[in-house]
Design a protein with these regions (language model features):
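A flexible loop/linker signature enriched in serine peptidases of the S9 family
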Residues: 1-3, 13-25, 36-44, 52-53, ...
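Signature of short aromatic-glycine-proline-rich micro-motifs recurring in repeat-based ectodomains
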Residues: 8, 51-60
């Protein structure tokens, strides 16, 4: 049936079967009108989203920039930056994994898990796949966070007993580098050659002091005075300089 005919005096337009047509009375020719609607494509636009409330806790970009290790809802995922396959590398609904960190050589992903009842370090071989391997055991407190050494030979973590612990994930051994029972060691970071550490910790007067620590000699050296509140140390990429923040404006 023809519905809703309308004319401008020259042509007649009407609806039939859900489509619009135009009729030329002079020629009695009828033609379907094809309609294309422009759109702002609101739902196709890129959008920045806060996914923190949805369970994501950390992410680490692979050295080649092609994939990310993401921890979300207690699982570790190997996720492509662009198109590709997303892999759940833990599959452990009974435990909580977090702090996934890609090794600088791109071969491994290290993370913290509590499947044993205490937090331990785990290692996943990216190329080989398979199950992650537990590389520490019999831990006696909560691990705060971990990081790889730049040479990809060790994993460093801090814990609630205010220790800095260095782990050899391949030999499955660990050693306590330093412990400060009174205060938490903060801003811990390796030097680019993996031979030094830098960190900050409060002095007795509560001012934060920056230190460097030589791993070979096991010696600690203060970099700043206790009269200034200094923190957030980081090595320059060539390892020649130490950069930090310091509050030295007295008013």
């Amino acid at each position: 049936d023809v519905k809703f005919p309308s004319t401008n005096g020259k042509l007649i337009v009407y609806e039939k079967g859900g489509y619009l047509y135009k009729l030329d009375p002079a020629t009695k020719a009828s033609e379907q009108i094809h309609i294309s609607l422009g759109s702002d494509l609101v739902y196709a636009r890129a959008e920045r989203m806060n996914v923190g409330k949805k369970g994501r806790s950390s992410f680490s970009l692979s050295p080649d920039g092609k994939r990310m290790a993401i921890t979300a809802r207690g699982e570790v995922f190997d996720v492509p930056v662009g198109k590709g396959i997303t892999r759940n590398i833990t599959k452990t609904p009974g435990s909580n994994e977090r702090s996934a960190d890609w090794s600088p050589d791109g071969k491994y992903i290290a993370f913290i898990g509590d499947g044993t009842g205490e937090t331990e370090d785990y290692l996943y071989d990216v190329a080989a796949g398979g199950e992650p391997v537990q590389v520490t055991k019999d831990n006696d407190t909560y691990i705060r966070d971990l990081q790889w050494s730049p040479d990809s030979k060790h994993i460093l973590y801090t814990d609630r007993k205010n220790r800095i612990v260095e782990v050899d994930p391949f030999a499955k051994t660990k050693r306590t580098v330093l412990q400060c029972p009174e205060q938490e060691l903060r801003d811990v970071e390796y030097s680019p050659d993996s031979k030094w550490l830098t960190y900050s910790r409060p002095a007795p007067n509560k001012m934060s002091v920056v230190y460097v620590y030589n791993l070979a000699s096991a010696k600690e050296y203060p970099v700043t005075e206790k009269w200034y509140d200094s923190s957030s140390p980081t090595f320059s990429t060539d390892g020649k300089y130490l950069i930090f923040t310091s509050d030295r404006d007295f008013r």
